[in-house]
């Protein structure tokens, strides 16, 4: 189903590849068999906040001889200057006084809690926290780490954009790749064959979220449908 100009339309196809997120498939394919439905409950996704911070300069990092790094306290785990794309013969030079975008990655780990509970609580925090609170924490974190080398949040930050990813990263548990206790891996239940005219793809099934595995999984699923006889 989709809408266009305020009108709803229905699309029919002889075969379909379900390449959507693993947490949604069992709610879309309503007649999914028990084995596949159970398999889809075994895919776990962790939330992530990506903050893109527009900086008027990055001299405070340049003085330290770095363009990014990891840390272990406070908000976030990693920050780095984004690469500026260059096209054709264009030459891009970035000096310490150039305006740039600093990307900050924030994870929501709660060591000691079961994985699913960590993810559920993390998603709740990710979504419920207002922008102003994230902005305050970002300014405080950068000030705490870089004030000594000249960072001034009021002067240097031109803007902040937040991308809230509730199901950002696949989190494979023991048995995800090769099975457990003599039982097949849950991903293989979905990858090995189509469900009638429906095949399943998504980077979740590979355990490696990237554009490469997305293409490979899509090709595999399409091949299963093309190789199978379609009747009716």
Where are these predicted regions, by residue range?
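Conserved flavin/dinucleotide-binding core of flavoenzymes
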Residues: 3-6, 54, 60-232
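Glycine-rich loop(s) and the adjacent beta-strand/alpha-helix scaffold that form part
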Residues: 3-73
């Amino acid at each position: 189903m989709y809408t266009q100009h305020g009108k709803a339309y229905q699309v029919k196809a002889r075969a379909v590849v379900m390449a959507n997120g693993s947490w949604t498939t069992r709610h879309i394919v309503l007649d999914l068999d028990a084995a596949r439905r159970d398999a889809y409950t075994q895919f776990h996704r962790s939330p992530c906040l990506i903050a893109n911070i527009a900086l008027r300069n990055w001299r405070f990092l340049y003085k330290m001889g770095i363009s990014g790094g990891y840390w272990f306290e406070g908000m976030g785990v990693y920050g780095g200057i984004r690469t500026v794309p260059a096209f054709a013969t264009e030459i891009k030079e970035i000096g310490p006084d150039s305006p740039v975008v600093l990307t900050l990655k924030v994870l929501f780990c709660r060591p000691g809690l079961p994985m699913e509970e960590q993810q559920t609580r993390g998603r709740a925090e990710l979504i419920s926290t207002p922008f102003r609170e994230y902005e305050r924490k970002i300014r405080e974190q950068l000030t705490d780490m870089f004030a000594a080398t000249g960072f001034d949040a009021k002067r240097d930050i031109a803007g902040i954009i937040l991308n809230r990813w509730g199901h950002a990263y696949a989190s494979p548990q023991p048995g995800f790749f090769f099975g457990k206790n003599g039982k097949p891996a849950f991903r293989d239940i979905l990858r090995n064959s189509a469900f009638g005219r429906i095949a399943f793809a998504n980077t979740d099934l590979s355990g490696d979220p990237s554009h490469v595995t997305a293409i490979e999984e899509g090709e595999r699923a399409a091949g299963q449908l093309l190789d199978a006889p379609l009747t009716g």
